[in-house]
Amino acid sequence: MVIFLAVLFGIVGLDRLVIVYLFPVLLPELKLNNTQAGAIASVLALTWAISTWVLGSLSDRYGRRKILLGSSIFFSVMTSFTGVAKSFHSMLLVRGLLGVGEGGVFSASVATIDEISTPRRRGLNLGIHQSFFPLLGIGLGPIIATQLVMHMRWEWVFFVLGIPGFLLTFLIGKTMRKAEASRDKQARSASASPLTVLRYKNIWLTTVIGSLFQTGLFVFSTFVALYLTKVVGLSLGTVGLIISGWGFGGFIGMIAVPAMSDRLGRRIVLVVSAACYGVLMLAFVLCHASPIVMFCNLFAAGICGFGIAPLFLAVIPCESVPSTLTGSAVGVPTAVSELIGGVLMPVVAGGLADTFGLGYPMLIVGGVSLVSALVGMFLEETVPTATSKRSVSNMDAV
């Protein structure tokens, strides 16, 4: 089940990010500027934010399976429909609807894995789940996108990429059918308000960390292809290979870093990894290097940066609240961080790029990562001990 959900989330990452790798082709053809490119990336983050919170809360009440399967079908349809959009406004509409489905997949799948995992394997399992986002979305995504667009029109790229989501939805539906029955019944009995999770200090802190991280993630992913082609002067094929290092490193980091936190503690692993990530991302922009060095830099940065994402988006929120609130606990940090980091900042960064050049948005990434390391120092440790995390309802709440 974990592997199926992980692959599905990887497809979510691929369908979400593939458009930014095609911006060098799309922007001239659709006559769009950098600010509009940022808006296209931002609208998906906006609807993802809303649906993650809303659909995550609904999955607490009505069960994971219904929300997960419905969201999966919907985002697959919208991925294919992206190939039909031929104007700025139609692209905004389709990509916004895509975010609705993808947000539901994220919150419902994280809550499902939290429920089926033992405390000692929770970090590892959630890390495996989220590791497929950078693997398919950022590691293989640039290669897939840039190679496909060399052999077919960009519209057909989106039609092709919509197919895997339907296949995974069918497989997950068959696998979850029996396992979900008892959990659905338990979920319907949950009556707490989704806002109850705001009583817990760690939810607030992971929300801040998530906002900083998502700022760096989506500013970088939105403009890195444009930066490397227009400023550095590299070919689109070379750019795809360089960016893939970020994703391949992220795949390793999202498994290794949460697994390390199972043994060493969530807080110390998050703080150290975030600090290393910030330094490496600043070096990527400030130190002009060859393509192979840039690949290696992003590979190392991906290990550190993406490695902490399962901690503040899933592991720590889930371990900080009672089991009946895990969907909401995941939804709040994700929703707010998507609104700030995914909606607002790409547009701001696009304005900076139009005014001062594409190098300025790249500097944002390293700076916000260093700040997130500082905020992480104030987290309360949640790593499981002899006492199950389900006794967390007795913890002090803010």
Q: Which residues does each predicted region cover?
A:
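C-terminal membrane-cytosol helix-exit motif in multi-pass small-molecule transporters
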Residues: I163-R183, V375-E380
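Cytoplasmic helix-loop-helix junction between adjacent transmembrane helices
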Residues: V94-F133
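Conserved MFS/SLC helix-loop-helix module at the cytosolic interface between two early adjacent transmembrane helices
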Residues: I50-K86, S261-R267
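Juxtamembrane intracellular "pre-TM" segments in multi-pass secondary transporters
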Residues: A179-T207, A397-V398
